[in-house]
Amino acid sequence: MTLNSRPDRGFPVIFKHQNLIADTEITKLFKEKKMSFNVGHTTFGFTMRVPDAEATAVDELIASHAAWMRDTHSVIEEEGKLHTLEYYVSKASELNDMMDPSKGTTGQVIYTVSEVHKDDEHFGKHVELGQSWDRINEFFGLFEKYSPLVTMSGRVTAKL
């Protein structure tokens, strides 16, 4: 599958097996995949600082978590998966001076893991489901080792 820009429409065109998917299917796909969370939805997230030398191991664990999330969760209603409104991970080198990147980095990487769930009940199901992930103890080990700032059962308070 390839993804090409459609500047005339403001969204990509998806080619599947070299055949163009009908515009109505594309529109439906984008409506389903767009960020569908709102103020009041339940959130979980954490931000942590990791030494550069340890980032590769953290990258691998987070990639495993993301794969588990893809296997067990979906941003659209999908049979056999927990409907989760949003999941993403961001990563950046920590700057010595965020107003002047030319001053270099601290030798730390900042990771942010963000999830948005429909409500507290769905978040609870996510926590329960997480117990079945074979690397959950390693994941919790991140909390012990890096002392992240954590938002547990937070609420979306603003969005575009």
Which ranges hold each PLM region?
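N-terminal soluble domains immediately following signal/targeting peptides that reside
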Residues: 108, 134-136
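Loop-helix junctions at membrane interfaces
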Residues: 141-142
